[in-house]
Design a protein with these regions (language model features):
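Substrate-binding clefts and catalytic carboxylate motifs of secreted carbohydrate-active enzymes
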Residues: 3-8, 18-20, 34-205
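Short beta->alpha connector loops
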Residues: 10-13, 28-34
Length: 205
């Protein structure tokens, strides 16, 4: 072969069932909790987060009260921009950051995604192929129940995964990554906007 081979693996068992042996560099999709054991069991093999985060948000949308449950925060085809929300198989950015810092032998991460894109509008996606992201059992049953609940309503057309939206405008999440990846760059990002007359006298996190 003329080049190294890698793969992004959704199935956590791929590292143990022989598939991992076919790869030069092992890629994990949404499995930050697996890094520690992988490094211990396979110290000879480099690894990285091949597809990470999948946090969802709409630029400039803030819903109250703030719900810290990662499966909440969406309403009327928008997702609150506090960057607390993600599908069941995915994570907030700080979860992956912590896993990368705790496992310095990881080669890093590829975030899903840099930009929003047309299609795959999770959490409003009516496409049952979403179920492929989770193993069979209670987690998949929960996902299918959510799809059924959405019913035949017209889905949103665009994804919410991007760090930057379809127009190229930075979401709040952009600054989370900038602060983490560019510690040399002094910055502060305050959200939501501070002149919000409708919320006068209310706590706005």
């Amino acid at each position: 072969p003329t080049r190294k081979v890698t793969s992004g693996c959704n199935n956590a068992n791929a590292a143990r069932n022989g598939f991992g042996d076919t790869l030069d560099v092992y890629g994990y999709n949404y499995k930050p909790w697996a890094y520690k054991d992988f490094a211990k069991d396979r110290p000879h093999q480099p690894f990285y987060g091949a597809e990470t985060a999948s946090c969802v948000s709409s630029r400039g949308e803030y819903f109250f009260p703030v719900d810290w449950n990662k499966g909440k925060g969406f309403y009327l085809y928008q997702v609150s921009s506090y960057d607390l929300y993600a599908p069941g198989w995915a994570n907030r950015p700080d979860v992956e950051f912590a896993a990368q810092e705790d496992n310095p032998n990881s080669a890093g991460e590829y975030v899903w995604t840099g930009f929003d894109y047309i299609g795959e509008p999770t959490p409003y996606n009516l496409d049952a192929t979403n179920a492929l992201n989770v193993p069979e059992g209670p987690e998949r049953e929960k996902l299918m129940a959510e799809l059924k609940k959405l019913g035949d309503r017209a889905p949103s057309r665009s994804s919410y995964f991007g760090i930057v939206d379809l127009c190229g405008f930075k979401k709040d999440r952009f600054y989370i990554y900038q602060a983490h990846w560019r510690p040399d760059l002094k910055m502060a990002h305050i959200l939501p906007h501070w002149n919000w007359p409708e919320r006068k006298g209310q706590v706005t996190p």
